Amino acid sequence: MTDTSTTSQTTSTSTTGTSGATDHGFSVRPLGQHIGAEIRGLDLSRELAPDTVARIRELLNRHKALVFKNTGLTTDEEQSRFAEHFGPLTAAHPTVRFTGQSSSNVLPVDSESSVANKWHTDVTFVINPPQLSTLRSVVLPEYGGETLIANAAAAYADLPEELRGFAERLWAVHSNDSDYVRPDRVTSDAERSYQEQFVSSAFRTVHPVVRVHPLSGERGLFIGAFAQRLKILGVTAEESLDILRILQRHVTKPEYVVRVTWEPEQLVLFDNRITQHYAIDNYDRQPRKLNRITVAGDVPVNVKGERSYSVEGDSSDYSQIVEP
């Protein structure tokens, strides 16, 4: 199918749903040259037709992050059903457990317990991080609380040729005991409990610094907070930190970032294999809750086809390994 969504005008797609249901045409509007597209007119609370799912996957491969407006989603069950169109679901988290949730697959991204204002890719400390993440708005502050999402493929492509070749030879150790769980300030017992649970079981996995996307073939910088200040194999700790800082600055260049402003009944779907994201802490810690459901992923590979490997921790209860 030809993708016309990168033109300056809004495009439309019409599909027929399963069981006689009809999904009306939906519009696609790019949000930037390198990342992001807004989708309207698609009811995600209903079962989607296979060709609709294929079109969404196609758009995701191109735009890396899709912002669905007026989705019709009101429950975790509906969000789970949408996410399952793309593969088996993971558990909510490898170490953090939540009570009172309707499903073991739902991770509440709640301002009462955590603030994810560090650039990261979800759960890269396990052998097969999620391939996709979905975030659904549940409770929103009066202002602020936007989410930034960065295109790690565009960042890789922007590197000088010599630096690209160097990065392709590197491997990084990702751990759940990282700066991600060391916020600048702890404001409640709930935050302290969340941090303690996050590191309650140790995970360390070695991933390529440049990962090849299994569907698009694109190369992207696979780093972020869980690799930050951790040793890159073959260099000193100080050199590791300097190299990671250089590469990370490319990932978060404004040209490669989309800023998502949250609205009611909104869902964001992003490709966790080739993006990073950051939750802006600019809302005075008003109540803010997004529910996250993730889709099980594959084991990352580098440009030579070499696979990531686990050093510590068993994540089999968190996620099955899927093949692309």
Task: Annotate the PLM regions.
Residues 2-267, 273-324:
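Non-heme Fe(II) oxygenase catalytic core, chiefly the N-lobe of the double-stranded beta-helix
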